[in-house]
Amino acid sequence: HTNVIHTGHARDIISTLPEKSIAACITDPPYNYEFIGHKWDADEIRRRLNNVNSTKSSTLVKNIPYGSHLAGGVRNARWYERVRENILDYEEWCYEWALEAYRVCKPGAPVAVFNSTRTFAHVQVALERAGFYARDCLVYRRHSGIPKGLNLSAKLEQKGDPDAESWAGWHSSFRNEWEAIALLQKPLENNYTNTVKNYGVGVFHTQDPSGRFASNIIENIPSDARDNGNDYPTAKPYALMARIVNFLVPPSNNNVILDPFCGSGTTLLAA
């Protein structure tokens, strides 16, 4: 199974892997959004991205599900019920693939799962239910991002409300410039030293590229070149994935990394 991309349902593919064979699981699963819709083909991706970037379009996203919290409609009791149902369905989906990931991970194997700042707690709970225990939340700081939601002053001004100016600077959400990485670990075999000796994993490489003790905030990551031929809309920078691999996985030919949602393959290249 090493150095191979398998296509199929993540849970079903992971079920074919040997027990206690994986040194780390590093993955960037769907965030419970629908930014590019259900068709993951390059033409559809390109069409929607071009629409988003067009100065003639005022629409940022279309067909938004309740999971994004950007969906329109009246915010009545049923709206909030559907938001709750949606996120619990997502948590259950994470739990399903995490159960198999737990089986194939070695004792002490770290699991790093990217997710949005709003939903990563549900991912952590799902993985804890599967048997992993929480270690940290790593922060990938991007130094970018656009505000999403309602500009109250602008909305009131559209309606001709005389109080519009008094609400200048008030918005329904903050500008998001970071992504969460839920960091969990399969329980150790008695202690750290036994686990490392028997399985080659269990501790973190805590020296960052500058030689300092690494923190749980990862920043100053260069972006990949725009003309690298990668049309995948949510690809993570290679430098980011390489740093995470360096932090979590001791270099060894016996250490295999699992990425159940490999996207354009950045984690695979970094490994």
PLM regions with names:
Residues 1-271:
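S-adenosyl-L-methionine-dependent nucleic acid methyltransferase catalytic domains
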